[in-house]
C-alpha cells in the first residue's frame, strides 16, 4: 500500500458507480462503510448533475461488525428493490467491505427477485476505476444478452442492404465523469448522420436495460473509449459476430480515418478526404504563417490511454510540435501507449505516481504540458503552460457549454485549448522582457485575471529565480553576465537552456559560465 496526496483513479467500485449513474432503470447496492459515500460528491460537484447517483449504501459501522452484516446487506437490497423498482440490480462491495467477505452478490441472487441481478466482483486491491467501469459494463451486457446471443445468427455488417434500411451503429463507452463524453457523443452522432448512418443505442450513457437488449439490432459497434468499451465490444464480436471500430476520432486525421473505417465495415463508398478537412479550422491554421511560432514546440503528454495517444498524434502530425514525453496511468492501455511512444522514438512513462510524472516533466523541459488536473498543478509549479486533455479533471474541465474533443468541432476546441496557453506564454515573456522599460505601467491588467501586472512581475521573478538560483553545478560558476543573459530567455524554456549550457561548459572544461558561454552553447545545441 502506498500513501499519496493525489491518485489518478479511484477504486473499481467508483467505476461501477459511473456506469450505474450513466444508465436509467438500474440500481447499484454497494456494501460499504459510511466513509465510502464520498463518491456521491463526484457527480454533484464535478459532473454537476441535478440528481444523485442511483446507489444504495449499506453503510455499516464499527459496531455492526460484531453482529450479522449479511442481514444488513439483505435488508438494504430488499428496501432498494421495493423503493426504486429497477429493471436490473447491480450488487457489489467497496474495498473495505471486501475484507468482510459477505459476498453480497451471491446473497442477492438467492433472495428470489424476478429481475436480472449482476454480481460485481471487483478486486479492489489489484484493479482501479476504469477497469471497474469496463468490467461493470461488460457484466451488464453479458447478463442481459447471454440468452439472446445463443439464439441469433452471426451479424453481417452489410445486412442493412438486404433489410432495405439505413445502416445502424451502437456507440459504446461514454460514461459520466468521462472527459467531455456528453459532447463527444453529440458530435459523433452528427458526423454519422451526415454520412447517412443512424445511431441505434448509446451506452452506458443515457441507456437502459431495455436498450442493452437492443444492441444486436445494430450492424456494427463504435468503440468510442477503449478503456471502458473494448472488453464489451470483444464479447459482442465473439458471441454475436458484431464488428467494431478501433479508430478514435480525436483530431482531423483520426476523424477522417474513423469515417473511412466505418464506411469500410458497412460497405459504404469512401468520402472525399479534401472535403472533410475543411470542416475544421485546425488544418488551415497549422499551415498558416501565424502558426510558425508554434512549429517545433516541445510537448509533454500524459493522461488516460485513449486521450494521450490521440493528443500525441495531433501534436506531431497536425500542429508540428515535438513530443518529448508520452505516458499514461492506465495499465490496461500500457501496450498501446508504448507502441505510440516507440513511433515517436521516446520511452513511454507508465505510472500512477504524479511525482514521477512531475520529475519526467522537469527532465523533458517541455514548452507545453498536455495532461490531467494533476499535471496542471505540476506545470504551474514549474512555470510551464498546460492544457487538460484527460481525466482526472476538476469542475473547470466540465464546461456547461458544448465543448467536445472528438470530431470536427473537437478539433476546433483542441486548437483553442492548446494554442492559447502557448500564445499567452509569449505575452508573459514580452512583459518580462520590457517590464523595466520606463514606459511600463504596473497598473495594467494581465490576461491572467483581474490582478495587476505587479503580481505577474512577482510570478515571473519567481520563475527567473527558480531557474537561475543555483550558482554552481559541480565546479562551474555562473557569472553575473551569464545570469543576466539567462533571464532574457523565455521562462518556459529557461530550464532547458540552463541545463544545456551547463552540459556544454562541463564538456569543454570551463570553470565559469558567462554570456559568451551561453551564446556558444546555443550555437552548439542549435
Curated annotation (Swiss-Prot):
[4Fe-4S] cluster binds at residue 36. One of its GO terms (molecular function) is 4 iron, 4 sulfur cluster binding. Substrate binds at residues 425-426. The keyword Nucleotide-binding applies. The active site is at residue 290. Keywords: 4Fe-4S, ATP-binding, Chlorophyll biosynthesis, Iron, Iron-sulfur, Metal-binding, Nucleotide-binding, Oxidoreductase, Photosynthesis. Pfam families: Oxidored_nitro, PCP_red. It comes from the Bacteria. One of its GO terms (biological process) is photosynthesis, dark reaction. Its EC number is 1.3.7.7. Protochlorophyllide reductase is composed of three subunits; ChlL, ChlN and ChlB. Forms a heterotetramer of two ChlB and two ChlN subunits. Belongs to the ChlB/BchB/BchZ family. This is Light-independent protochlorophyllide reductase subunit B. The gene is chlB.
Amino acid at each position: 500500500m502506498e500513501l499519496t496526496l493525489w491518485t489518478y483513479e479511484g477504486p473499481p467500485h467508483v467505476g461501477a458507480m459511473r456506469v450505474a449513474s450513466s444508465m436509467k432503470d438500474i440500481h447499484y447496492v454497494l456494501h460499504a462503510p459510511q466513509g465510502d459515500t464520498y463518491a456521491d460528491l463526484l457527480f454533484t460537484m464535478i459532473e454537476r448533475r441535478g440528481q444523485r447517483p442511483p446507489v444504495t449504501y449499506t453503510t455499516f459501522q464499527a459496531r455492526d461488525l460484531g453482529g450479522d452484516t449479511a442481514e444488513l446487506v439483505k435488508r438494504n437490497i430488499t428496501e432498494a428493490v421495493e423503493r426504486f423498482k429497477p429493471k436490473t440490480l447491480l450488487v457489489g462491495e467497496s474495498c473495505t467491505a471486501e475484507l468482510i467477505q459477505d459476498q453480497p452478490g451471491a446473497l442477492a441472487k438467492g433472495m428470489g427477485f424476478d429481475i436480472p441481478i449482476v454480481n460485481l466482483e471487483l478486486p479492489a486491491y489489484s484493479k482501479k476505476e476504469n477497469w471497474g467501469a469496463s468490467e461493470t459494463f461488460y457484466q451488464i451486457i453479458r447478463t442481459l444478452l447471454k440468452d439472446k446471443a445463443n439464439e441469433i445468427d452471426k451479424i453481417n455488417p452489410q445486412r442493412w442492404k438486404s433489410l432495405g434500411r439505413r445502416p445502424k451503429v451502437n456507440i459504446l463507452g461514454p460514461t459520466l465523469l468521462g472527459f467531455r463524453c456528453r459532447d463527444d457523443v453529440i458530435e459523433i452522432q452528427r458526423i454519422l448522420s451526415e454520412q447517412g448512418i443512424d445511431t441505434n443505442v448509446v451506452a452506458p450513457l443515457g441507456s437502459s436495460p431495455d436498450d442493452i437488449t437492443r444492441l444486436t439490432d445494430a450492424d456494427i459497434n463504435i468503440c468510442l473509449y477503449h478503456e471502458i468499451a473494448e472488453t464489451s465490444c470483444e464479447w459482442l464480436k465473439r458471441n454475436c459476430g458484431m464488428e467494431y471500430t478501433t479508430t478514435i476520432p480525436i483530431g482531423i486525421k483520426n476523424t477522417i480515418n474513423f469515417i473511412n473505417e466505418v464506411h469500410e465495415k458497412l460497405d459504404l463508398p469512401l468520402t472525399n478526404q479534401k472535403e472533410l478537412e475543411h470542416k475544421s479550422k485546425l488544418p488551415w491554421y497549422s499551415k498558416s504563417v501565424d502558426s510558425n511560432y508554434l512549429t517545433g514546440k516541445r510537448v509533454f503528454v500524459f493522461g488516460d490511454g485513449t486521450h494521450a495517444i490521440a493528443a500525441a498524434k495531433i501534436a506531431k502530425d497536425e500542429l508540428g510540435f515535438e513530443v518529448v514525453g508520452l505516458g499514461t496511468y492506465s495499465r490496461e492501455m500500457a501496450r498501446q501507449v508504448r507502441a505510440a511512444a516507440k513511433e515517436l522514438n521516446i520511452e513511454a512513462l507508465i505510472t500512477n505516481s504524479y511525482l514521477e510524472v512531475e520529475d519526467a516533466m522537469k527532465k523533458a523541459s517541455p514548452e507545453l504540458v498536455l495532461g490531467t488536473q494533476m499535471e496542471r498543478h505540476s506545470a504551474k509549479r514549474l512555470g510551464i503552460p498546460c492544457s487538460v486533455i484527460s481525466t482526472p479533471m476538476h469542475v473547470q474541465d466540465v464546461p456547461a457549454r458544448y465543448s467536445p474533443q472528438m470530431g470536427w468541432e473537437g478539433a476546433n476546441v483542441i486548437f483553442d485549448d492548446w494554442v492559447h496557453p502557448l500564445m499567452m506564454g509569449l505575452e508573459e515573456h514580452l512583459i518580462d522582457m520590457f517590464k523595466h522599460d520606463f514606459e511600463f505601467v504596473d497598473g495594467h491588467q494581465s490576461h491572467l485575471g483581474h490582478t495587476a501586472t505587479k503580481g505577474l512581475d512577482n510570478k515571473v521573478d519567481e520563475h527567473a529565480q527558480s531557474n537561475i538560483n543555483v550558482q554552481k553545478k559541480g565546479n562551474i560558476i555562473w557569472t553575473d553576465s551569464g545570469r543576466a543573459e539567462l533571464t532574457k530567455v523565455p521562462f518556459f524554456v529557461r530550464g532547458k537552456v540552463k541545463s544545456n549550457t551547463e552540459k556544454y561548459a562541463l564538456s569543454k572544461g570551463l570553470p565559469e559560465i558567462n554570456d559568451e558561454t551561453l551564446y556558444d552553447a546555443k550555437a552548439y545545441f542549435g
